[in-house]
Amino acid sequence: MMTKQRPRSPGRPKQTSDETSTYDVILGTASRLFMENGYEPVSLQHIAKLCNVTKASIYYHFTSKPELFKIAVTTMLQRGYEQTQICLMKSGTLTEGLLLIAEAKIARPHAEMETILREAETFLSKEQIEEIRDGERAIHQLLADHFEKEIQSGVIRQKNPLLLAQAFSALLMLGNREDITSKYASARELAEELVEIFWQGAGS
């Protein structure tokens, strides 16, 4: 399961609403900094300063920087899974769902996940890395399940649905390139072209 319980030392009093808010502020700030800058350039001191809390406060909620990174990334991936599911479920066709996913991702560009993880792996435990990979796999499997339905109905040629899911995700990373996004008037316009390119290869 991707949803993790917030760490609390044995015997520590139950969190108040203020403490919960502090947890969320730290987690949100850390998530943004990690995705913008990668793992190593981000310090707990910098996070504490931006959150207007002490470094000790961060350690109260998170045992270490690697654990904070892991929770930040898995929380983001869980949110991405939920948003992907919403886009796919509320759309009349898979094409419409992919377009919504692409538009949302392009509108909120961030560093390429694989690059960030490669840099952070040195500092993370095998268990932390596996939890993050599980989050990635869940999103790919969700997409793959929908591609499989289209394959079974004949909309898509017989292909590996998981490979299609990973290929689609990789294609969307082009939305992070300023030399590409600058040539389009909106995230929607670029999303439409990327989805069209994807379907040219995947469609029947």
Report each predicted region and the residues it spans.
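Helix-loop "lid/cap" segments that line or gate small-molecule binding pockets
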Residues: 84-87, 103-109, 117-124, 197-201
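N-terminal intrinsically disordered/low-complexity leader segments
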Residues: 1-21
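Helix-turn-helix
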Residues: 22-25, 29, 33-67, 71
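Hydrophobic/aromatic-rich alpha-helical bundle segments in the mid-to-C-terminal region
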Residues: 116-122, 129, 133, 137, ...
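Short coil/turn segments at alpha/beta junctions that flank glycine-rich nucleotide-binding fingerprints
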Residues: 36-40, 91, 112, 153-154
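Amphipathic, non-transmembrane alpha-helical scaffold segments
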Residues: 27, 73, 77, 129-140
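Short amphipathic alpha-helical elements of helix-turn-helix/winged-helix folds
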Residues: 29-33, 108, 171
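Hydrophobic alpha-helical connector segments
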Residues: 71, 75, 82-111, 164-168
